[in-house]
Structures are given as C-alpha cells and as structure tokens.
C-alpha cells in the first residue's frame, strides 16, 4: 500500500527586509526566493512581482507590502518587503507585519544612509528583537578596506541603538548578481552568499515563543449575567491558555487589579475544560458582579500585566488622503486612544523642540490617559477623534 508522505512541520518565523531606499531590499528578497527555489524550498518571485506590492489597509491606514514565503532546511519563513519608506514606518508602527527579526540591507558602495538609521531606530522602538546585516552591491567595491569600514560603520550604528553591534552577523554579497546567476550552488561566489545569509538568519534569529505558550490574556468584549450562575465575560483569547478553576485578574479601568476564579468556560454554547489563544469564549467568573467588570478591561494571569496611565509611544499620524486630520496638532492635544476593545481619552505631550506634528509624520510622544488601562511594551493602539482614526501607535516604554 502507498504510504502517506511524511511532512515535518518546520518552525515558523516572520522576517522582513529593512534599509535605505535603493540599497537593494527588494532585489535581495527576489534573490532569496530564486536561490532557494533551486533547492525546492521556495517559489521564485521576480523583482517586479515583489515591487508592485498590493495596497493593504491596517487600522484604516493604506500600506503597500509584499509578502513572500520560503523555507530553509531548518525553518519556514514569511518575509515582508515594502516598496516605499513611508510603508515601512506605517508597517512597523501598526504591527501589520510583525517581525521576529529583520535583514538590514546596506549598500557597500554607499554605506549607511538616513533611512538606514531611521529603520534601525524604528526596529528598536517597536521591538524588532534581532537584526542580521547584508552588505549589498559588494561587486561594486574593489577595496577590501572600504568594505571593512562600511561594516564597522553599520556595527557602530546598530550599537548606538542598543543592538549588539559586535555580535550581529554581517554577510557581504550582491543580490543582483545572485539574481542574475540563480544557480543556487553553495560554491557560487554570488548565490553562495545568499545561502550564507540565510544560514545566519537560521542561526541568529531565534524561533519566537508561540502565543499559546505566553501568559494568559483575554480582552473583555462583552459582559452579561446568567441567572443563578453569575457573570460571564466574553472575548477572544489573545495569548496563553486558561483552565476551569484557575485564578485570573481583571485589569484596567481601575487602579488595582482584582482577582477572581474562572468557574466555567464556553465556546459556541459548548462547555470547555480549557481555552487557548485564538478561541472566542465566555468565561464565568466567581463572585464578580455585573457592574464590576466591563468592556475595555482584560482577564489575565495574575501578576503578568498591570494598569498604567503614563507611557511613551512611537506614533504615525494619518495624512488627509488616508482620512486623517487636515491640520497639525500641538502639545496638549486630547484625542481618544483605542486599546484592544475600548477608547480612553488622554493628553499628548510632544518631545522638546517639537512644536507641532503634521499629518504624515511619525514621532515619539508621551501620553497620559485619564483612566488606567492594561498596557505593556509593544502594545498597538489607534488614535481617534470623533470616532475616526487619525493615527496609529505602539507603546515603547511605560512611565507609571
């Protein structure tokens, strides 16, 4: 009898190419798919297929992003590449393309440029944890000392933004030459470098922890009472797992978290013993009155998340064309901040030397909410005014 094919499920990692315009990010993306396709690990994508990325909308913001997928011997990758600089800014701030690591592409012929710096800063701010460097256009640099100089410059720049500049893997090659050759052989002077780069990505960027292995958290979407049983909070489990009889905390919209026990779990009217990340559930809570829990709070594993009012964030302000504001805003601007399931009013404080923020800008700001919310670094939010989105942000540091 015919045996079913054994398919090993490889660990999945999200990565992306970042770096200055015209340094070769898209060419490298095409080269990676071309070289790996020769080994049966990818579908070859042409430069123009990647470059003409479709428009997507994330939180009302228009972003052009190309998604390609490929495998190495060890892992499966989803890779994002953006045609324009503004697309990177929006992508990284909205978290439309969450990256577990990034390949920073720097032209060896030009060295680090303004967007190189800006992308490294953004990666630091929004929590891209690991960077691997590809020094592109190495075929245009004859002087090995110049190559070393550029590498040192990139390492210093990474260290400036608190990446381990001395440890970061750096591979020099030519994406264009590899793309033109496309033999995919390890001993090829061009294709070999692409394989070497992917080896470094395999080794250096760790496989991320799966959502289900993180501590339990569920944003509360709705609350109702079951006569004779008690109060039920419904929502989608964002991460972790929860079992009947476990203790949880209700966090947010009040100064201190409140403990309770989950005494029942339901999904689609069926009773569950356990719910995991991605499940839409109703959780029956012991001793909690209907008035003591509301939308906008979260249920969480005790001690894993706290309510906060003051924090720093990196934000992108929508342009008029994206449906955002037509005019700048100033220090003391009071919009709503939409976290998970609810709007909370807050005040924006601009950094010193920044007079105003124009539509289309990205800027680091300080926010003070009027009521505490369950917040942690890396949490995404929308800035809204009268029900329409005028900006997107990510929490970069918590003050109190």
From Swiss-Prot:
Enzyme class: hydrolase
Source domain of life: Bacteria
Keyword Transferase: no
Catalytic activity field: GTP + H2O = GDP + phosphate + H(+)
Known EC number: 3.6.5.3
Pfam families: GTP_EFTU, GTP_EFTU_D2, GTP_EFTU_D3
Ranges where the tr-type G domain occurs: 10-209
Binding site for Mg(2+): 26
InterPro entries documented for this protein: EF-Tu_GTP-bd (IPR041709), EF-Tu_GTPase (IPR050055), EFTu-like_2 (IPR004161), EFTU_2 (IPR033720), G_TR_CS (IPR031157), P-loop_NTPase (IPR027417), Small_GTP-bd (IPR005225), T_Tr_GTP-bd_dom (IPR000795)
Entry's localization field: Cytoplasm
Positions of the UniProt region annotated as G3: 81-84
Region G4: start-end pairs: 136-139
Function of the molecule: GTP hydrolase that promotes the GTP-dependent binding of aminoacyl-tRNA to the A-site of ribosomes during protein biosynthesis.
Protein family per UniProt: Belongs to the TRAFAC class translation factor GTPase superfamily. Classic translation factor GTPase family. EF-Tu/EF-1A subfamily.
Protein name: Elongation factor Tu 1
Upper lineage: Bacteria, Bacillati, Bacillota, Clostridia, Thermoanaerobacterales
């Amino acid at each position: 009898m015919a045996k079913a094919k054994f398919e090993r499920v490889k660990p999945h990692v999200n990565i992306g190419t970042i770096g200055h315009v015209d340094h070769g990010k898209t060419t490298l993306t095409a080269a990676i798919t071309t070289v790996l396709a020769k080994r049966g690990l990818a579908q070859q994508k042409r430069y123009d297929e990647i470059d003409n990325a479709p428009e997507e909308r994330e939180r009302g913001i228009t972003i052009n992003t190309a998604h390609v997928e490929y495998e190495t011997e060890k892992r499966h990758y989803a890779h994002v590449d953006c045609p324009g600089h503004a697309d990177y800014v929006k992508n990284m701030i909205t978290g439309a393309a969450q990256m577990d690591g990034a390949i920073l592409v720097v032209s060896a012929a030009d060295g680090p440029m303004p967007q190189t710096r800006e992308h490294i800063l953004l990666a630091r701010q929004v929590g891209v944890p690991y960077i691997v460097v590809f020094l592109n256009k190495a075929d245009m640099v004859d002087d090995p000392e110049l190559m070393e100089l550029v590498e040192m410059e990139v390492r210093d720049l990474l260290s400036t933004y608190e990446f381990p500049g001395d440890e970061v893997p750096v591979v020099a090659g030519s994406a264009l030459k590899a793309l033109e050759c496309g033999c995919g052989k390890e001993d090829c002077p061009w294709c070999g470098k692409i394989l070497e780069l992917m080896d470094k990505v395999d080794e250096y960027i760790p496989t991320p922890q799966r959502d289900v292995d993180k501590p339990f958290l569920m944003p509360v979407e709705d609350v109702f009472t079951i006569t004779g049983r008690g109060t039920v909070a419904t929502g989608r489990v964002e991460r972790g797992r929860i079992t009947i009889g476990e203790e949880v905390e209700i966090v947010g919209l009040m100064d201190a978290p409140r403990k309770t026990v989950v005494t029942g779990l339901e999904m689609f009217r069926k009773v569950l013993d356990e719910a995991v990340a991605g499940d839409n559930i109703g959780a029956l809570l012991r001793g909690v009155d209907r008035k003591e829990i509301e939308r906008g709070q979260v249920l969480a594993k005790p001690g894993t998340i706290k309510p906060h009012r003051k924090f720093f964030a990196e934000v992108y302000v929508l342009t008029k064309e994206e449906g955002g504001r037509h005019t700048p805003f100033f220090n003391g601007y009071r919009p709503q901040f939409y976290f998970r399931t609810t709007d909370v009013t807050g005040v924006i404080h601009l950094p010193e030397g920044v007079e105003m923020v124009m539509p289309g800008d990205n800027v680091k700001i300080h926010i003070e909410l009027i009521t505490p919310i369950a917040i942690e670094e890396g949490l995404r939010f929308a800035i809204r005014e009268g029900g329409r989105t005028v900006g997107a942000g990510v929490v970069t540091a918590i003050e109190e």
